[in-house]
């Protein structure tokens, strides 16, 4: 575990941010920025509004030897109870915007909220992105994980990805990026920051689009714990198939292992949908981590299948 940032280190760092007119906030409880509502207080959260500020912040991080992590919509994260040994970077300003470029092409900022953004784009009469209106979080995070559901993936629609790496802005086509099921090369490149994407959609029938939006919304609502704080599906489907060719789902393995409803502290494996862990109101990151380890061990013992996490850890979680 890394040491807590010193007061003098933070003081000089914040003074430089002020001089550079880069927006930031101090002593922010990160749990309020996550769908899990779990996470402790971070000493500083920096909120750049334009690309040049992002580049400048990375230079400042290096100058003061400040460890940092980037936080998006917080929908697929388990945040540490003690995120006090790093600074959080969270895009704002122009990164929260999307614009039509005409002929079905849209430029979408990394800090746009996926659900309303792709619903609005679909309601303009363009089809192909309806499934993304059911995925919570921000577009940047959706890019990193190649988010998808109902047979669609974000990279099916992407024309280009704009990202910053080592202080330089790049624009890459999907053919120039490694990606797959719930994976892109950005997952393993912590020095890369997604800035935005361009997508291309086809014109469609608005009545059919509205019907598709409603169908996917209803399916999503029926497959998740209702009105519960969670980070979405905890485990990836293992890509293992039965003799009849049907895919074995992660939730089935949890259910067969007798894990439905298991509780640790304020966290519970959902009785309704057991590939979800829910915050009953007082859950800590350690509570959730305990249940994750329990699932991995028990499922392996009962099925011989090793499950991989879909949610990401943010900070040190014992």
UniProtKB/Swiss-Prot annotation:
Top-level taxon of origin: Bacteria
Cell cycle among keywords: yes
Functional pathway: Cell wall biogenesis; peptidoglycan biosynthesis
Principal localisation: cytoplasm
Record keywords: Cell cycle, Cell division, Cell shape, Cell wall biogenesis/degradation, Cytoplasm, FAD, Flavoprotein, NADP, Oxidoreductase, Peptidoglycan synthesis
Enzyme Commission number(s) of this protein: 1.3.1.98
Catalytic activity from the UniProt record: UDP-N-acetyl-alpha-D-muramate + NADP(+) = UDP-N-acetyl-3-O-(1-carboxyvinyl)-alpha-D-glucosamine + NADPH + H(+)
Cofactor needs: FAD
Subcellular location: Cytoplasm
Region of interest (Disordered), residue spans: 212-232
One cellular-component annotation, GO: cytosol
Single Gene Ontology BP annotation: regulation of cell shape
Entry's Gene Ontology molecular function annotations: FAD binding; UDP-N-acetylmuramate dehydrogenase activity
Record domain FAD-binding PCMH-type: where: 38-204
Active-site residues per Swiss-Prot or TrEMBL entry: 182, 233, 310
Residue spans of biased composition, Basic and acidic residues class: 212-229
Short name of one Pfam family: MurB_C
PANTHER family: UDP-N-ACETYLENOLPYRUVOYLGLUCOSAMINE REDUCTASE (PTHR21071:SF4)
Family: Belongs to the MurB family.
Function, as annotated: Cell wall formation.
Protein name: UDP-N-acetylenolpyruvoylglucosamine reductase
Organism of this sequence: Leptospira interrogans serogroup Icterohaemorrhagiae serovar copenhageni (strain Fiocruz L1-130)
Lineage of producing organism: Bacteria, Pseudomonadati, Spirochaetota, Spirochaetia, Leptospirales
